[in-house]
Amino acid sequence: VPAAINSYINYTKAYALFAIKVFCNATQPQTEGAMRPITIKAREGSFFNPKFPAPSGGRAILQIRIFDTINGAMSKALPKKAMGAFSHWSNPNIGGIDDKTSKPFVMYDLSLAGYGGRYGEDGPEALTPVMNCTNIPVEVHETHNPIRVKCLELLPDTGGAGQWRGGCG
């Protein structure tokens, strides 16, 4: 696609393997032998295997979408291992000119939200989706940017209803 959200095949394979591993044995070491039985293919020139120089910058967004797609498909065969969809991304990007220094600034953060519920338990709250990152503490933003955070809290009832609800964010 013309937007910077294409998933080159190396990312498509990595994200798909992650999703499949969650269903098989998430604690098994990530080795070539463990992944060898899995084949991942995508038509060349497609969204999941674009031709260079197709733009691809939104890889974090893709990871969650690919995971949710495979999770949804696998849930038909293994419903007790599946989970509800992630909250996806809503990252604030704030920028401008600092009134005190007259210098430009850009502030970026990860908005933490809930994971989907799964068989037997509610989804966890206020986590980043599946990629080993975290938000930047409020104190860091306030120290390095001309902003003031008035409130940072979990919003009740935002995780989606169900026997096992999604986590709030």
Name the predicted role of every residue range.
Residues V1-C168:
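Glycine/proline-enriched, intrinsically flexible loops and inter-domain linkers
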